[in-house]
Design a protein with these regions (language model features):
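Conserved beta-loop-beta/alpha segment of the NTase-like Rossmann-fold superfamily
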Residues: 75-157
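N-terminal glycine-rich phosphate-binding loop and ensuing alpha1 helix
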Residues: 1-77, 99-100
Length: 157
């Protein structure tokens, strides 16, 4: 199974809310992609960013490869994150968009990954919204098990 994590959102609403905060409490978050924002503190030592938690979760399971899809504005943020977190930089796909008005959408972003990395077309693909927070006890193996039980894809024996 391959995992594609979508982190291509342009965060317009969140960024405007952070920019309009006059207290200065959130200044360090200006421009930071939503998936790289701090997540709730974990008690088990997992990473503190939303994407870091997803990477830890899928990296410890039977996932062959993980890909990120991002936009041109946030690409450098994810490139730095990848370097610091042992994520293969070549698995970051830039959809080239620079604003919410030019965004491609999830289906087009998935198509972009499939065209850019044609070898994954032979694999089952799990798609994740990279800015979604999950509970500390979430176990992705349950998602994989459900997929197999429902025969989401014929298993090659």
């Amino acid at each position: 199974m391959v995992c594609v994590i979508f982190v291509a959102g342009h965060n317009d609403l969140l960024e405007s809310e952070i920019a309009s905060d006059v207290s200065g409490r959130f200044d360090k978050l200006k421009g930071v992609p939503k998936a790289l924002l701090p997540a709730a503190a974990s008690t088990d030592g997992t990473p503190s960013t939303i994407l870091g938690r997803w990477w830890h979760l899928v990296n410890t399971r039977q996932i062959l490869e993980v890909f990120l899809v991002t936009n041109a504005n946030k690409f450098k943020y994810y490139e730095r994150w990848a370097t610091a977190n042992d994520f293969p930089v070549e698995n970051i796909i830039n959809d080239g968009t620079t604003s919410a008005a030019s965004r491609m959408g999830s289906v087009a972003d998935l198509d972009l990954v499939l065209r850019a990395k044609p070898s994954i077309c032979e694999s089952d693909v799990m798609v994740v919204a990279g800015d979604m927070i999950f509970s500390n006890d979430f176990d992705i193996s349950g998602v994989q098990r459900f997929f197999r039980e429902k025969q989401g894809s014929p298993r090659k024996e």
